[in-house]
Amino acid sequence: MKQKLHILFVIAVALLGLTACQKSTKDQLVGTWHYVKTMTIDGNTVRIEGTDTNDEDGTYSSVANAVYTFDTEIEGVSVQIKMGVSFKGTGEWTVNDKEIVTTPTSAGVKVTSLKYYDPSDGSFIAELTGNELTETSSAFADELKEGLLEASTEQILVLQENKYVAESTDEDGGKTTCTYNRLK
């Protein structure tokens, strides 16, 4: 009987130790994460590469670069446009069950390049620079900034020590899955 009690006590202590060592989902997400994701918005390709830093106090900072690729016509001529955009943002983050909820408090957007290509063969046509680039892209940058200041939710699909996979759903019901790799 005494031996059975001892075995049960050892098992109970081991289980208690295991549960005491487990980190909460939020604690596991604290750190700096790198991601690359490609998605389609309104039929156009967007490739984003960035870094998010989630702090213990529930704040975050984010920097990213994106390339938007879309086809259009200018004065009856078909062109493919590749627009480079850089983003910066800060805000608050929390975890509810297996969802990451971010509430932005500031966002910055800058169009860094605007290049035109022939869609039939991919050959370079032209590039806007300087004031032309700023004037042409300012309305687009303002619209993007407005969108970045909206709260968002990502469903955590996989959570490991150095990687997590999350899925977001856009307003049209389209889903985007992204893998985040820990930098620190």
Language-model features and meaning:
Residues 1-20:
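Sec-dependent bacterial lipoprotein signal peptides
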Residues 18-184:
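Lipid interaction determinants
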